[in-house]
């Protein structure tokens, strides 16, 4: 019973994180199929120069994360679009993901709206803005060094191949209905974030709105995903639900774009969720058996001074 209770309590503690991961999976699929991400990619490729893309991505994610106080929301929304822009401009996934995550977590650490920042200052009984000021001693130099690295990497990137970017833009136009109306979805999401609506509610409403826009602007794609020969609301709804929970692969004449618009929905988050559940089960068993306390006590004996800590 003790083991069962400890494991149950651990899993209950990460239930919110698991729900957020599932909604992020659904959001990433719906934002792609609805045309929101393709629209952001289409306009982003025309605005952001490849030489400064990585540094710009880091700064954009940092600013949004500071304003929202949520690195997860930043990565799940604007991060997806920036990943698409970077891949279209020929950058490797690792560089793009590094720029997105670096900016998002920097903003999260110094944002007065961040739950982790507020929690840390509360636990240590430190005024919030004093805590942020001390955090900036390490985070700001880290960000500056990171921006220098991303700038050098961006300037070293071959930005002369504009034909490739033009081909991706043309393929996007052929596959999706690109329209400024689709920008309403990220704008509404930004408003919800600014009004401090909880992350789960924000992501859910953003997914729901993108689903409505998918039915309006991308019915042909939903029909293709559903695999149903006869067009109708049932087939469109089936295509929408398949995008939410499973993998979707749409064929285009551009190999880069075909890979770019492939989504995995909620199913893409299952490996991470299984890992979290296994870790919680292991941690619960270690706690209930007393082994975790025994191991911790050994380390505590040596933590007598600041240097040893």
Predicted regions: what they are:
Residues 2-87, 246-309:
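Membrane-embedded alpha-helical segments and adjacent helix-loop junctions characteristic
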Residues 33, 37, 70-74, 120, ...:
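Transmembrane helix-loop junctions in multipass membrane proteins, especially transporters and channels
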Residues 39, 43, 105, 109-112, ...:
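Membrane-spanning helices that line or support transport/gating and their immediate boundary helices
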Residues 109-171, 181, 285:
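Juxtamembrane and boundary regions of transmembrane helices in multi-pass small-molecule transporters
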């Amino acid at each position: 019973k003790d083991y069962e209770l400890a494991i149950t309590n651990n899993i209950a503690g990460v239930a919110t994180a698991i729900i957020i991961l599932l909604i992020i999976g659904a959001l990433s699929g719906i934002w792609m199929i609805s045309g929101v991400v393709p629209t952001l990619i289409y306009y982003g490729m025309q605005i952001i120069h490849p030489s400064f893309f990585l540094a710009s991505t880091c700064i954009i994610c940092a600013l949004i994360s500071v304003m929202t106080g949520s690195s997860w929301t930043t990565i799940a929304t604007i991060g997806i679009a920036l990943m698409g822009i970077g891949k279209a401009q020929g950058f490797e996934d690792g560089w793009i993901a590094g720029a997105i995550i670096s900016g998002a977590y920097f903003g999260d650490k110094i944002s007065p709206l961040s739950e982790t920042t507020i929690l840390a200052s509360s636990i240590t009984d430190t005024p919030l803005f004093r805590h942020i000021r001390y955090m900036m001693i390490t985070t700001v130099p880290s960000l500056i060094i990171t921006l220098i690295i991303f700038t050098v990497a961006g300037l070293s990137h071959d930005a002369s191949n504009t034909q490739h970017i033009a081909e991706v833009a043309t393929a996007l136009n052929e596959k999706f209905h690109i329209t400024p109306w689709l920008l309403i979805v990220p704008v509404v999401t930004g408003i919800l974030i600014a009004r401090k609506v909880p992350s789960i509610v924000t992501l859910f409403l953003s997914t729901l709105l993108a689903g409505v826009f998918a039915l309006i602007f991308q019915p042909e794609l939903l029909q293709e995903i559903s695999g149903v020969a006869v067009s109708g609301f049932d087939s469109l709804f089936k295509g929408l639900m398949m995008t939410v929970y499973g993998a979707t692969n749409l064929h285009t004449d551009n190999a880069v774009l075909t890979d770019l618009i492939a989504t995995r929905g909620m199913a893409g988050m299952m490996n991470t969720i299984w890992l979290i559940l296994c870790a919680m089960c292991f941690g619960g068993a270690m706690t209930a058996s007393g082994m975790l306390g025994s191991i911790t006590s050994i380390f505590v004996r040596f933590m007598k001074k600041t240097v040893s800590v």
